[in-house]
Swiss-Prot record:
It is an enzyme of class 3 (hydrolase). This is UDP-3-O-acyl-N-acetylglucosamine deacetylase. InterPro entries: Ribosomal_Su5_D2-typ_SF, UDP-acyl_GlcNac_deAcase, UDP-acyl_GlcNac_deAcase_C, UDP-acyl_N-AcGlcN_deAcase_N. PANTHER family: UDP-3-O-ACYL-N-ACETYLGLUCOSAMINE DEACETYLASE 1, MITOCHONDRIAL-RELATED. The active site is at H265. The gene is lpxC. Keywords: Hydrolase, Lipid A biosynthesis, Lipid biosynthesis, Lipid metabolism, Metal-binding, Zinc. The keyword Hydrolase applies.
Length: 305
């Protein structure tokens, strides 16, 4: 039986909030089988819970933000969510003492190290997957994202920025998902932004924690980070990272073929909602026999970094 996963022990880290620029403490705790992924705002009294749910994503302007019926929010969840998807963690309590998850270095890599440091433990309950059964597509102008059936998790993402530092040879990335592939090919890709946009946003009191330490920054001609890129196609890899995190808002690893063109948090969420709203388009599956599991999900719990 392919089993559910949680952490072996709790672990804590501090970082900076991307939007507030303030110190944020993040605590990750083990959870019982079938708990799912649950975010908590511990700075509020009483504590407010945000179970991972695509319908709770109500702001996708600059990040993926969960907002409850009372308007309480928790922002920038997508990179941590991507790390959970990458390692196949089903059940976890995520506590944060601020309205946002710390940005760390702008990638999912620090969260991977944190989760592996806590240790991953299999639980005595069958792991559920969402299997795509029918073709589903959403569009927004020339942007689009789609799912179709596939026995694995395959991703194909294309960006299109008219910028001299983003050549046509670094605008597409394709990958067959596995824990190892995510850790080595995707998790280290950092978020990015354009200097003119960042200056405007900071004048509006946003992205106050943004810097060259936690983002790739481009002016009109070049990349401003002294150390350059971690991959020549780091930007499109980060967009794939975002998509993996956004799609894991379902709370389950997905078996299907995902393809997107110029998609962002909003369209990723729209696709996930469209899939889940059509009961003919998907089903829950579990696997008693490891031989039946799609190759990308057979990986051992421990991942070598």
């Amino acid at each position: 039986m392919i089993k559910q996963r949680t952490l072996k022990q709790s672990i804590k880290v501090t970082g900076v909030g991307l939007h507030s620029g303030e110190k944020v403490t993040l605590t990750l705790r083990p959870a019982m089988p079938n708990t799912g992924v649950v975010y908590y705002r511990t700075d509020l009294n009483p504590t407010v819970a945000f179970p991972a749910d695509p319908n709770s994503v109500r702001d996708t302007m600059l990040c993926t933000a969960l907002i409850n019926e009372q308007g309480v929010r928790i922002s920038t969840v997508e990179h941590l969510n991507a790390a959970l998807a990458g390692l196949g963690i089903d059940n976890i309590i995520i506590e944060v003492d601020a309205p946002e998850i710390p940005i760390m270095d702008g990638s999912a890599s620090p969260f991977i190290y944190l989760l592996l440091d806590a240790g991953i433990e299999e639980q005595n309950a069958a792991k559920k997957f969402i299997r795509i059964k029918e073709y589903v597509r959403v569009e927004d102008g020339d942007k689009w994202a789609e799912f179709k059936p596939y026995n694995g998790f395959r991703l194909d993402f294309t960006i299109d920025f008219d910028h001299p530092a983003i050549g046509k040879d670094v605008r597409n990335y394709e990958m067959n998902f596995s824990a190892q592939a995510f850790v080595h090919q995707i998790s280290r890709a950092r978020t990015f932004g354009f200097m003119k946009d960042i200056e405007y946003l900071q004048s509006q009191g946003l992205v106050l924690g943004g810097s060259l330490d936690n983002a790739i920054v481009l002016d009109d001609y070049r990349i401003l980070n002294e150390d350059g890129l971690r991959f020549k196609d780091e930007l499109v890899r980060h967009k794939m990272l975002d998509a993996i995190g956004d799609l894991y808002m379902a709370g389950y690893n997905i078996i299907g073929d995902f393809k997107a063109y110029k998609s962002g948090h909003g369209l990723n969420n729209k696709l996930l909602r469209a899939v889940l709203a059509n009961q003919e388009a998907w089903e829950f599956v579990t696997f008693e026999d490891k031989e039946q599991v799609p190759q990308g999900y057979v990986a051992p719990v421990q991942v070598l970094i």
